[in-house]
């Protein structure tokens, strides 16, 4: 049996826009109200996904959310025709309309937490959609996310799907952006790292003062229980609250791991050495490569601006590891110098590949945000909805679909355009047929 890690990237939706919705996310906030290019954004994401497939990686795509989300606008009291609802919301509650048009589901690192069958008690691959309760615009995603995941991983013999955690701040859960799995080989039992920003039930525990901590210890522990993980293969690490206050809203902005490598910034965690000792002890006899980036070489500001740690580390078919980085890392002198040095240090990371994902970066997410990691074996891969897996035919078809349905310019004011509803629903209805997803959206019910 073969084992590997698949990446399922979020397909950028037709309403990709810069509304500046995410307090604590420096890039999102600083680009608020800029004019976006949904067509370019979608094509940049598809190009990155296809490039990884061409490298020999298993690569899938996850469908975007339905936006504008008129179902939520109706839930909060707006009524009338679709056009009337948009018009009323734009006039009476523009911030709520922007939230209901969010493009953030493209960042599937926040879609769910995934535990592979090698780690779980029942030997199934487990998925729990993130509840994303800290941000209104993301808190409306989990039900549809669950539908899309169930339509993608649609075999109960191999996959177990859980409901998202209770919608309360005590269980704030941001998905795989705060979860890393280390292992010797993808088919071996690994060590699952859950990184949290605060303890909801302990008012005396450290927490940030300026920006919110979006992941709680209690949420991480609940997911470990749901997924049937043992104490022997879980480690809980506290994020450094000071770096959260400097714009590190998720752990994947300050650390990233793959197999026996944890690549992290010097200031990423609290109680670092004790926690790393625990990781190594639970990992076993093989060595974990803890690759620390010193503050003296890369500041927190440069790490956040460039998204040095919001890169993907992948294991190529050759066995070498490579970093998939945004071109922003090339454009930052300190970060580019560090990455050039990194590949000479004798670690498992041997190369860096750069991709232009600026439309995503300007909205606050880099290459790692765009993908959900799923370690699996070939039997499980055969049980996945094959129409969601990247190949030449799907790449061609999805690019043609984007050309047909997406605008190349979208401002925040355009979100009130009733035509956008028709365009978006027409596109998504066709997409569910391309990817054979069935009726996953509210408008299809």
Curated annotation (Swiss-Prot):
**Pfam families named among the record's database cross-references:** AstB
What's a Gene Ontology MF term here? N-succinylarginine dihydrolase activity
Q: Which GO terms describe its biological process?
A: arginine catabolic process to glutamate; arginine catabolic process to succinate
Sequence positions that bind substrate: 19-28, 110, 137-138, 214, 252, 363
Q: Which UniProt keywords apply?
A: Arginine metabolism, Hydrolase
Q: In which pathway does it act?
A: Amino-acid degradation; L-arginine degradation via AST pathway; L-glutamate and succinate from L-arginine: step 2/5
Enzyme Commission number, as recorded: 3.5.3.23
Uppermost EC category: hydrolase
Question: Which reaction does this enzyme catalyse, per its entry?
Answer: N(2)-succinyl-L-arginine + 2 H2O + 2 H(+) = N(2)-succinyl-L-ornithine + 2 NH4(+) + CO2
Q: Does the keyword Hydrolase apply?
A: yes
Which residues constitute the catalytic centre? 174, 250, 369 (nucleophile)
The text of the family note is: Belongs to the succinylarginine dihydrolase family.
* Subunit structure of this chain's protein: Homodimer.
PANTHER family named among the record's database cross-references? N-SUCCINYLARGININE DIHYDROLASE
Functional summary from the UniProt entry: Catalyzes the hydrolysis of N(2)-succinylarginine into N(2)-succinylornithine, ammonia and CO(2).
Quote the protein name from its UniProt record.
N-succinylarginine dihydrolase
Taxonomic source organism? Shewanella woodyi (strain ATCC 51908 / MS32)
């Amino acid at each position: 049996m073969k084992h590997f890690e698949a990446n399922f990237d979020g397909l950028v939706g037709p309403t990709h826009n810069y509304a500046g919705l995410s307090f604590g996310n420096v890039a999102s906030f600083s680009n608020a109200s800029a004019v976006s290019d949904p067509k370019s954004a979608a094509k940049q994401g598809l190009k990155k996904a296809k490039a990884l497939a061409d490298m020999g990686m298993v690569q899938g795509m996850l469908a975007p959310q339905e936006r504008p989300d008129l179902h939520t606008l109706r839930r909060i009291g707006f009524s009338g025709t679709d056009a009337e609802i948009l018009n009323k919301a734009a006039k009476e509650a523009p911030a709520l309309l922007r939230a209901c048009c969010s493009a953030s589901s493209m960042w599937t690192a926040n879609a769910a937490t995934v535990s592979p069958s090698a780690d779980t008690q029942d030997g199934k691959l487990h998925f729990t959609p993130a509840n994303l309760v800290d941000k209104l615009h993301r808190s409306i995603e989990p039900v549809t996310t669950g539908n899309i995941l169930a339509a993608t991983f649609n075999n109960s013999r191999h996959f177990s799907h859980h409901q998202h955690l209770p919608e309360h701040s005590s269980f704030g859960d941001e998905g795989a952006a705060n979860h890393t799995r280390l292992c010797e080989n993808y088919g071996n039992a690994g060590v699952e790292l859950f990184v949290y920003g605060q303890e909801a039930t302990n008012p005396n525990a450290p927490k940030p003062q300026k920006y919110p901590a979006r992941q709680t210890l209690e949420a991480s522990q609940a997911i470990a229980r749901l997924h049937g993980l043992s104490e022997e293969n879980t480690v809980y690490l506290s994020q450094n609250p000071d770096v959260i206050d400097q714009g590190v809203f998720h752990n994947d902005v300050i650390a990233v791991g793959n197999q026996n490598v944890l690549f992290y910034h010097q200031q990423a965690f609290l109680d670092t050495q004790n926690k790393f000792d625990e990781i190594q002890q639970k990992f076993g006899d093989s060595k974990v490569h803890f690759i620390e980036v010193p503050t003296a070489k890369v500041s927190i500001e440069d790490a956040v601006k460039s998204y040095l740690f919001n890169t993907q580390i992948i294991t190529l078919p050759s066995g070498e590891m490579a970093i998939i980085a945004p071109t922003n890392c090339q454009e930052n002198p300190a970060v580019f110098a560090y990455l050039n040095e990194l590949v000479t240090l004798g670690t498992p990371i041997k190369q860096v590949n750069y991709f232009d994902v600026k439309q995503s970066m300007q909205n606050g997410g880099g290459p790692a945000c765009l993908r959900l990691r799923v370690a699996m074996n070939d039997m499980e891969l055969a049980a996945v909805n094959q129409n969601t897996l990247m190949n030449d035919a799907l790449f061609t078809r999805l690019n043609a679909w984007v050309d047909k349905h997406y605008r190349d310019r979208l401002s925040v004011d355009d979100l009130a355009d009733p035509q956008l509803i028709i365009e978006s629903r027409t596109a998504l209805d066709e997409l569910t047929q391309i990817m054979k997803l069935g009726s996953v959206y509210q408008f299809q019910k």
